[in-house]
């Protein structure tokens, strides 16, 4: 592993209804970036906020000498789509992603850049003494275990978005066309050298988490369907297992009837109902999982943009559009933008 030359660092931050956190976020992130020995830019992507977040970002980008780039999406597309929109606009040799809620402190940015300069393709982080509720921690642990088993990459905390990526990794992710993207997993698929560092984790000071129970369930389906086809194989295994259990149970019912007569359990009516519910439930679970895969395939086949950029405001020269080679054809754009200032 060789040291990686760095000339510019990009910080990409998705923003959704974070107007209370934005002033402190900008102040602390700018202070952390000024400690770096490189040029820097802070790219904030408004993901269809319903509060005043978009206007605050535009004002910050319009200030004289500002290193802030405001990317305004026309509606809410989700955290990972917003980060991909920021990736398209960044020009750094190292790109760092950061949440806007300040639970992961921007002061950790220099440490991530230091590790990336050593030659790592991906620098991940692990939240030390995580300040979330058990409702958030336990599903996160299950997801981390599932991801580790499926990808074979033993990283501890896939849910922490404070990460650093080498430019080549970002370009490789931009070349991917699927709509359902989980960035840490996608990046690890392209990385040769990865590492993890412990970072501080604070309680959320403003607002509330944007991940409700339904969004966490949706995220779990995204993880299952974007990283592996193992659930489809498991359906076959479960189907064979249930069929075998059904035959064994039928044999047991015959033996019980011969041994104890027809009245031993009310003619077996309730047992049959229980078996019916189990099999019906299993069928619906399988149909739902197949529907998830088919729905995502349908979305990918339509090839619509993952997001629509309404406008971009910056005081710096725009980053060149990433060049993507597909079947010998060169494409230089992966989304749609209405206005760039």
Curated annotation (Swiss-Prot):
Pathway: Glycolipid biosynthesis; 4-amino-4-deoxy-alpha-L-arabinose undecaprenyl phosphate biosynthesis; 4-amino-4-deoxy-alpha-L-arabinose undecaprenyl phosphate from UDP-4-deoxy-4-formamido-beta-L-arabinose and undecaprenyl phosphate: step 1/2; Bacterial outer membrane biogenesis; lipopolysaccharide biosynthesis
Function: Catalyzes the transfer of 4-deoxy-4-formamido-L-arabinose from UDP to undecaprenyl phosphate. The modified arabinose is attached to lipid A and is required for resistance to polymyxin and cationic antimicrobial peptides.
Name this polypeptide is given: Undecaprenyl-phosphate 4-deoxy-4-formamido-L-arabinose transferase
Protein family according to the UniProt entry: Belongs to the glycosyltransferase 2 family.
InterPro entries: ArnC_tfrase (IPR022857), Glyco_trans_2-like (IPR001173), Glycosyltransferase_2 (IPR050256), Nucleotide-diphossugar_trans (IPR029044)
GO biological process: 4-amino-4-deoxy-alpha-L-arabinopyranosyl undecaprenyl phosphate biosynthetic process; lipid A biosynthetic process; lipopolysaccharide biosynthetic process; response to antibiotic
Cell location: Cell inner membrane
Reactions mediated catalytically: UDP-4-deoxy-4-formamido-beta-L-arabinose + di-trans,octa-cis-undecaprenyl phosphate = 4-deoxy-4-formamido-alpha-L-arabinopyranosyl di-trans,octa-cis-undecaprenyl phosphate + UDP
UniProt keyword annotation of DNA-binding present: no
Transmembrane segments: 235-255, 269-289
Pfam hit, one: Glycos_transf_2
GO MF, one annotated term: undecaprenyl-phosphate 4-deoxy-4-formamido-L-arabinose transferase activity
GO CC annotations, alphabetized: plasma membrane
Record keywords: Antibiotic resistance, Cell inner membrane, Cell membrane, Glycosyltransferase, Lipid A biosynthesis, Lipid biosynthesis, Lipid metabolism, Lipopolysaccharide biosynthesis, Membrane, Transferase, Transmembrane, Transmembrane helix
EC number from the UniProt entry: 2.4.2.53
Membrane topology of this protein: Multi-pass membrane protein
